[in-house]
Each structure stands twice: as C-alpha cells, then as structure tokens.
C-alpha cells in the first residue's frame, strides 16, 4: 500500500496545503493505513473506517487546534489521531506506554476534550464556546456525535441549553451511520446542503423572520412552509426547534459535498447542525457486511478477515452470566433482561434470541435503564440490569433514589469490574464497591471464579431487594460451572486455605492470586464472597486467631472492601495490624490486564512481596 500523500501529513497544517482534488486519494491512503494498523494491534475498526472523510474534511476546513473539535465517545478518532501527528504511535495503540484509543488532552493539543463515555461532546463544546465568548476569542467549536450517542438525554440537555445561549459559535455534526442515502436523494441533498449552509440563505431567512415578526400569522405560515419544503428531503426539524440551523443529510464519504458545506458553515455565526450519513466499515467489504463483528477486533489478517476462533478452554465471566440468565429465565418467567446498548458486550445475545419479549435494549440511557427496572420491580417483575461497572456511574442517582430507597427487587450484573485492559482509565470499573456499599439496602457480591459467579448471581437474584454482582472482563481461572441454580447463604464467606499467623481476606477474583501467595508464606485465605453484607462473624473469627490480616480486592482501596473490614474491627473494638491491597488513588492507564495487575503488585508474587515487606517479622 502506497502512502505518498499521507507521508507528507505531519499535522493538519500540512493537510491544508493540499489541493482539494488530492483529498480523495489521501482518504484512500488513510483508510488503508487504518485497516493495516488496527489489524496488527487490535482496536476499534468499523467506526474509524467510517469517519475517514469526515476527519479529513474537518481538519482541512477548520483551523485546528485553534478551533476545537470534540469527538463524542472517541473510539472513531483514529483518523484524527493519524492526521494530528500520531501516525507512528498507532503501532502501539492501546498498549501499555502507547497512545490511547480515545481522545486524551494530555496526549495532544488537538484532543480538545477527553472522551470515551457517550453523549458528552455537545456539553463540552458548548462550555468551550461560552468560554471563548467570555474571553473575546474568535474560534469555532465542533462536536462530532453519533446517532447512538445522540439518543441519550445529555445530548438534548446540551442542545436545549445552547438554544438560549447568545453569541456563541457551535457546530454539531451528527455522524449518522444507521441509514443510507440513495443516489437521487443524495444528489438533491448535496445541493440543498450547500444552499442551506450558504450565507445568502441564512441572511435571507433572518431578514425575512425580522420583517415578518410584525405580522405573526404570516411568519407562522412562512415557518411552516419552510419546514414542509425541507421535510420532503430532510428529517424532522427537531434540531431547529432547539435553535440550530439544520443542514443535511449529506453523504459523509463525499468530500465534494463535505468540504464546501463545512466551509459555508464555518462562515456562519451561531448554532449550526450538520447531518452527515456514513457507513461503518466503509471501504473494507468484510466490515461493511458485519460492522458489529469488526467493531473492536483483535489482531487479524485483512486479506482473510476475522476467523472463527477455537472455543477457549476457559469461559469468560460474561459467558457465565449469559448462560445463567437464560437458565434462570427458563425457570422464572418474571425475569426481564435490560441492557443500555451493550447486548454483545454484556452477554445478552442468546437471551434476546430465546426470550425476545423479555429483552429490553434501552439504548445509551443508563439513567432510564435503572428507573425502568425499578418500575418493573414495582409490578412484580424481576429485572436484571446487565451493565458495565463504569456505566452504572451514570445511573447512580436512580440506583439510590429509585431502587435502593424503595428497596426494590432489582439485580445488577456488573461486567468489566476492576481493570479493563486496553480501554484504559475511562472504562475501568474501579469504583463500584466504594459507591455501592454505602447505599442502604444494597447487596454487593464479588465472585472469585466462574462457579462462584453462578452461585452469587442466583443468590442475589433470589434476594428480595437491590443486589449487585461484580465480575471482571475476560476469562476466569477455569473452575467448573454447574448447571443448577443453587444459592449460598447471603453475607457468608468461606475459608479456602488454612495457614498460620496471617489471614488474607480476598474479595473477587484476586482470591486466586491470594491463594498463590499464601502457598509461599503459609497464610490462611478466606473467600469473602460478599462486601455487603460483610461476613462479620468470619472477620472477627479470623482476627481472633491470627496476628495480622490482609485484604485484597481489584477495586479502589479508598472506601472499598478493606475499609469495610477495618470498620468491622473498629466497631468490635479489635486492634490488629491490617494491610489493604487494591487499586491506588489514581487513574490506571491502558495496557494488558495481567501486566497492569502485576505492575500494581496485585498478582501472586506482588501480594507475597507486600506481605513480606509489612509483616516479615511474623514470617520469620
């Protein structure tokens, strides 16, 4: 693959030196480079193949980094990164010490705002626009947001606020990759986009509105006629009701449409809204045919595509959950499965196929997902909310106010708890223990392996109140998983290994690492199973017959399971040395999960080192 033009682009300033006729060729080179690069490292592919032309056009037209571009979610920002001087860094994308898979302010001045969670771009760009206005700085502010992210309430909250904010420059680009434009409509839309984004049209519309303001009935008639005319070839004028000048839809892969339209919009003050239609996987037929499969692939050969992987020897926790959900739904017809746009990631594909009437993908709407579950529970249903730990943060008020306060029977299956690897700090599920254990009525369970995951899911489901089960990304230790739906006593742990002098209290999958360390120092190991209700009896019994305790968790130490143990000891008046091991008060960057844990001293060797360093005298 030749990259003659791409080789000349070290920054957007170089891009803007090109003749516009060269952009199509550059787009082909950039798309080919994205495909080759991601196939070697893994990462998000379909979305990035779909934003090549849009990225080129934005940096070609706008004066970045002076003008601000905010990429919503950000997993579609690889072309942007390549065009802004990080082409060489793509070789280590999402690897420890390498560049992030998302925009990151500390990585480049072109990353105006850090993103990874959805629907934040318009709010951030609006804040920047107001700051520029207040400082007397003339610049453009662009929020690029996908059709999925646009469905979330936060995006509409931002547009509502923008509509009453005077004297700002804000362009929202809706990257719509869930529809297509037929050639005839596309040609007409391209013409209309140029017309509606032009200064004459904008000026004429504003003058006409000012004149007709004195004749309200005529103004209303003119407004309706304009909406009717545009409605023949464009979506409803919802966005104009927020005060935006709506333009589009136009083909997001047609640079001859994108560039002049953006140039026109750049010259217009105020609120502008450009609707572009793109195709996920554009230019790579395999990804076009199955954009979900190629959404976030690992390494693969582009010539043959992603091959069917051999069944792994060990099940992932997501698979264990998915099978449990189907089995429990077979037994209990009250069970309802809910996910906020994470069907594949949370393991609900089979559940949707088998129980379509009881499956609800509510879209990127975590707040709604939680309160929707609360409403179901009020009427005797048994909702299970399958959600990533990091995304539950977005529904926290609803969890407290709508579920826990009313003690409603809702089960939360928290996937990606702890470190998540390549996605990094933005997706890490490090905080759920701390923010859940302080909520009255809430149960917090942390299984140590696949078998325990099934047991604790059943236990929490049968509990008549709010409950959560947290489990990590990836495979477990290979524990055999039964087919039954047995439960265990709520709030009771068990001793997995008897030792001397030191007892390790493990919460979650780090119990396995604790067992490895204990074998070297002859320590007792308890699988605590529950952070809340904590097995107070077991904690005090272990404290009574050991000289020191160690708590281990893949979660934030501050406010975590170790804190619960310390609170129990203090309440009982027990004075005993306690070593807390877990995630530090810091955001952990991206990298391999196992390597990150080892670097934090949370593998077997690291746990042993920490215990020897703190309690060496007890081991002599």
From Swiss-Prot:
Q: Recite the UniProt cofactor note for this protein.
A: Binds 1 Mg(2+) ion per subunit. Binds 1 thiamine pyrophosphate per subunit.
Query: Which residues participate in Mg(2+) binding?
Result: 147, 177
**Pfam families linked to this entry:** DXP_synthase_N (PF13292), Transket_pyr (PF02779), Transketolase_C (PF02780)
What is one cellular component GO term in this UniProt entry? cytosol
Spell out the Gene3D superfamilies in the cross-references.
3.40.50.920, 3.40.50.970
The first-level EC class reads: transferase
Its function? Catalyzes the acyloin condensation reaction between C atoms 2 and 3 of pyruvate and glyceraldehyde 3-phosphate to yield 1-deoxy-D-xylulose-5-phosphate (DXP).
Q: Which PANTHER family match?
A: 1-D-DEOXYXYLULOSE 5-PHOSPHATE SYNTHASE-RELATED, 1-DEOXY-D-XYLULOSE-5-PHOSPHATE SYNTHASE, CHLOROPLASTIC
Kindly provide the name given to this protein in its UniProt entry: 1-deoxy-D-xylulose-5-phosphate synthase
């Amino acid at each position: 693959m030749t990259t003659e033009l791409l080789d000349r682009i070290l920054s957007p300033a170089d891009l803007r030196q090109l003749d516009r006729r060269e952009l199509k060729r550059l787009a082909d080179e950039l798309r080919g480079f994205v495909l080759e690069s991601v196939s070697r490292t893994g990462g998000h592919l379909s979305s990035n193949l779909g934003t090549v032309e849009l990225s080129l056009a934005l940096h070609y037209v706008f004066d970045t980094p002076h003008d601000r571009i905010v990429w919503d979610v950000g997993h579609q920002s690889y072309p942007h990164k390549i065009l802004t001087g990080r082409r060489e860094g793509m070789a280590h994308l999402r690897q420890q010490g390498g560049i992030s898979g998302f925009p990151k302010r500390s990585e480049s001045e072109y990353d105006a705002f850090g993103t990874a969670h959805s629907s934040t771009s318009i709010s951030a760009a609006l804040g920047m626009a107001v700051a520029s206005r207040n400082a007397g700085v003339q610049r453009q502010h662009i929020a690029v947001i996908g059709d999925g992210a646009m469905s979330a309430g936060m995006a509409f909250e931002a547009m509502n606020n923008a509509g009453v904010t005077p004297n700002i420059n804000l362009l929202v680009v809706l990257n719509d990759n869930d529809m297509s434009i037929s050639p005839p409509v596309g040609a007409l839309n391209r013409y209309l986009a140029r017309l509606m984004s032009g200064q004459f049209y904008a000026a004429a519309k504003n003058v006409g509105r000012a004149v007709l303001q004195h004749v309200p009935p005529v103004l209303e008639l003119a407004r309706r006629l304009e909406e009717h005319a545009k409605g023949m070839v464009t979506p409803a004028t919802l966005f104009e009701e927020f005060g935006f000048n709506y333009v589009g839809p136009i083909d997001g892969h047609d640079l001859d449409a994108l560039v002049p339209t953006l140039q026109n919009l750049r010259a217009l003050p105020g609120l502008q809204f450009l609707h572009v239609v793109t195709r996920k996987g554009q230019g790579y037929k395999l990804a076009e045919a199955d954009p979900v499969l190629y959404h976030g692939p690992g390494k693969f050969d582009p010539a043959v595509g992603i091959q069917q992987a051999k069944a792994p020897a060990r099940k992932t926790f997501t698979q264990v959950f998915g099978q449990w959900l189907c089995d429990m739904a077979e037994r209990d017809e009250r069970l309802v499965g809910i996910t906020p746009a994470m069907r594949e990631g949370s393991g609900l594909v089979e559940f949707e196929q088998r129980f379509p009437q009881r499956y609800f993908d509510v879209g990127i709407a975590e707040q709604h997902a939680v309160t929707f579950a609360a409403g179901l529970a009020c009427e005797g249903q048994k909702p299970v909310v399958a959600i990533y730990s990091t995304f539950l943060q977005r529904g926290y008020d609803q969890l407290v106010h709508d579920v826990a306060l009313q003690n409603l029977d809702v089960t939360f299956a928290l996937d990606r708890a702890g470190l998540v690897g390549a996605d990094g700090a933005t997706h890490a599920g490090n905080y759920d223990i701390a923010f859940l254990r302080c909520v009255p009525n809430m149960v917090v369970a942390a299984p140590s392996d696949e078998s325990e995951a099934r047991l604790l899911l059943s236990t929490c489901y049968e509990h008549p109140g709010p409950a959560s089960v947290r489990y990590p990304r990836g495979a477990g230790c290979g524990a055999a998983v039964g087919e039954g739906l047995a439960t265990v006593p709520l709030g009771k742990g068990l001793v997995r290994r008897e030792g001397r002098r030191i007892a390790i209290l493990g919460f979650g999958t780090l119990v396995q690492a604790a067992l490895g360390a204990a074998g070297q120092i002859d320590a007792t190991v308890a699988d605590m199973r529950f952070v809340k209700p904590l097995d107070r009896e077991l904690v005090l019994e272990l404290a009574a017959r050991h000289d020191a305790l160690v708590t281990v968790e893949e979660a934030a130490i501050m406010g975590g399971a170790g804190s619960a143990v310390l609170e129990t000891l203090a309440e009982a008046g027990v004075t005993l040395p306690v070593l807390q091991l877990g995630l530090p008060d810091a955001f952990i960057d991206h990298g391999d999960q196992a390597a990150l844990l080892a670097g934090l001293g949370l593998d077997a060797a690291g746990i042993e080192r920490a215990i020897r360093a703190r309690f060496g005298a007890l081991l002599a």
